[in-house]
């Protein structure tokens, strides 16, 4: 991998909100050797290759904390309907696009047809470009749960298990498949015929068995938990990342605050907002979605995240991209929502995407900031996202993405294997 010094950068290390003018990052064999002011560069770099950033913004790679790389940018009822070989090609393409968008890490919240594990292995082997992927498999849910057919899913998209021992067996099968993540549905979705939010679809006994079995086998547990009841159930039994958490009561907020050093929350609000704005393209007009409660869900989510922010609970960026109305590569839209809807500063939103997302994605603490000794995962941006967070949505502004000390450019081209257009 060799060594490289990136200099003359506006450097956002990601530990806090500080930006270092005329900053530098020294990368050596895939790790950060130094980050700070150019004037503080240690001796020994005189003969190292240098890259002049020309004042560009250098920041840690971001984490997509609720990813579905097997989603194929289609209607929700047509997700993952393709034959396995085509689905795998889609997933490979989606991994490239996510990395090219500045996301160097990702936490899977469900993968159809068992695509995640071979995808992760190919990325780790350097065969294809993609983010560091905490891989899952099919969604785990009970009979009649949201996993059991809200969008017409078949067995390629779900594992249905009822009772503690059936759940343990299912999780053991996921461990055998070498998954990193177990995704469990604890309640439902407003579009669900059987399980709307607030209707718990697993008992406490079942959730306790799931979390215990997963943790024994070195896997983490992420949940679909929209209601306060489902959030409290997740906290009680020690899950690792809670997806959605739209409706929170005082007790749920207090429980999350008490466990804020152990549990992360990923609101994944893009689905609700885009469903309201563009649902008519899916045959789901806005007034019908408002009647289903989606506008209320957006309003409740905004209130919930503001309360979590006040309680210093770590809130993560990402969620449910990969539909035709939320295609892969638009994931940075989440940071705009964090600023415009949740009231965060641009630097707070960026810390959610980098520092906090990295802590959730890699429990060894090796990603999320540009501190010495960590993996050299960074993004070079032509412009300052602290002045306009929307810059990160403009792929032409993502000049380069480094992962493991390897610089990737032109990943967003339709064919990234040819020289970029001048």
For the regions a language model picked out, list residue spans one by one.
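Metal-associated gating/positioning segment near the N- to mid-region
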Residues: 56-125, 143, 205, 237
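Active-site core of metal-dependent hydrolases
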Residues: 188-299, 316, 321-323, 342-344, ...
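Active-site metal-binding motif and surrounding structural segment of the metallo-beta-lactamase
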Residues: 39-59, 84-85
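C-terminal cap of metal-dependent C-N hydrolases
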Residues: 9, 13, 20, 353-355, ...
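N-terminal metal-binding scaffold of metallo-dependent hydrolase/deaminase domains
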Residues: 1-44, 58, 385-389, 406
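Active-site mouth loops of central-metabolism enzymes
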Residues: 76-89, 150-169, 220-222
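His/Asp/Glu-enriched, well-ordered alpha-helical/loop segment
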Residues: 216, 286-289, 299-384
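Divalent metal-dependent hydrolysis catalytic cores, especially in the metallo-beta-lactamase
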Residues: 90-116, 130-139, 179-192, 220, ...
């Amino acid at each position: 991998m060799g060594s490289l010094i990136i200099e003359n950068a506006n450097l956002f290390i990601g530990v806090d909100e500080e930006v270092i003018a005329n900053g530098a990052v020294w990368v050596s064999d895939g790790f950060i050797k130094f980050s700070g002011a150019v004037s503080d560069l240690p001796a020994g770099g005189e003969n190292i290759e240098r890259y002049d950033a020309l004042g560009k913004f250098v920041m840690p790679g971001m984490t997509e904390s609720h990813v579905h790389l097997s989603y194929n940018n289609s209607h929700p009822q047509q997700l993952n309907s393709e034959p396995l070989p085509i689905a795998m090609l889609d997933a490979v393409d989606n991994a490239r696009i996510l990395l090219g968008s500045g996301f160097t890490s990702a936490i899977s919240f469900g993968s159809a047809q068992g695509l995640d594990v071979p995808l992760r292995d190919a990325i780790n082997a350097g065969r294809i470009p993609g983010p560091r992927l905490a891989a899952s498999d099919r969604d785990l849910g009970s009979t009649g749960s949201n996993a059991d057919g809200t969008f017409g899913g078949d067995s390629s998209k779900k594992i249905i298990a009822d009772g503690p021992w059936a759940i343990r067996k299912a999780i053991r099968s996921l461990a055998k498949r070498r998954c990193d993540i177990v995704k469990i549905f604890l309640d439902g979705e407003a579009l669900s015929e059987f399980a709307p939010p607030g209707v718990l679809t697993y008992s406490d006994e079942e959730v306790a068995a799931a979390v215990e079995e997963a943790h024994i086998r070195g896997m983490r547990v992420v949940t679909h938990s929209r209601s306060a009841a489902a959030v409290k159930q997740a906290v009680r039994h020690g899950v690792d990342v809670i997806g959605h958490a739209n409706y929170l009561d005082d007790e749920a907020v207090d429980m999350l605050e008490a466990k804020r050093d152990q549990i992360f929350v990923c609101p994944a609000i893009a689905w609700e907002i885009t469903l309201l704005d563009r649902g008519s393209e899916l045959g789901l007009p806005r007034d019908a979605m408002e009647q289903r409660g989606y506008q209320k869900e957006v309003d409740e989510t905004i209130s919930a995240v503001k309360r979590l922010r006040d309680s210093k609970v770590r809130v993560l960026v990402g969620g449910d991209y990969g539909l035709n109305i939320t295609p892969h590569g638009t994931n940075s839209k989440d940071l705009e929502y964090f600023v415009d809807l949740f009231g965060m500063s641009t630097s707070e939103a960026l810390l959610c995407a980098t520092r906090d997302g990295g802590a959730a994605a890699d429990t060894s603490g090796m990603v999320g900031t540009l501190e010495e000794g960590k993996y050299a995962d960074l993004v070079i941006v032509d412009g300052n996202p602290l002045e306009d967070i929307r810059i990160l949505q403009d792929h032409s502004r993502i000049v380069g993405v480094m992962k493991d000390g390897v610089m990737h450019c032109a990943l967003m081209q339709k064919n990234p294997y040819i020289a970029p257009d001048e």
